[in-house]
UniProtKB/Swiss-Prot annotation:
This is Hemoglobin subunit alpha-D. Keywords: Heme, Iron, Metal-binding, Oxygen transport, Transport. GO terms for cellular component: blood microparticle; haptoglobin-hemoglobin complex; hemoglobin complex. Red blood cells. It holds the Pfam family Globin. InterPro entries: Globin, Globin-like_sf, Globin/Proto, Hemoglobin_a-typ, Hemoglobin_oxygen_transport, Hemoglobin_pi. Belongs to the globin family. It comes from Passer montanus. Residues 1-141 form the Globin domain.
Amino acid sequence: MLTAEDKKLIQQIWGKLGGAEEEIGADALWRMFHSYPSTKTYFPHFDLSQGSDQIRGHGKKVVAALSNAIKNLDNLSQALSELSNLHAYNLRVDPVNFKFLSQCLQVSLATRLGKEYSPEVHSAVDKFMSAVASVLAEKYR
């Protein structure tokens, strides 16, 4: 459960990305594909090289979905409902992959933000990403 302080930290840190959202999303995906090679199976048509247009484009979509979730922290289920349906019913993505992406996104954020990615921010982002993963996996039950 996200506390009021967690929500505040998440919104603040997201606001500091300053137009680097696509870059962070692409970096997180690239890290995921290389740290967890099994995730590549969902993207057989993608050029999975670092910085490819396809990774950048999908990274932008991932970050846009997370931005929408951050705007709707009190109603994540509704904010992510369509995305949950897509991943569960159409794409049939194994829910463990949401955790993999979460870990890689946190590394990308920490790398980008340096000291601003404090232990408190890390904890808040980890809770947020766990909540997102949980909501995305709801339709699998």
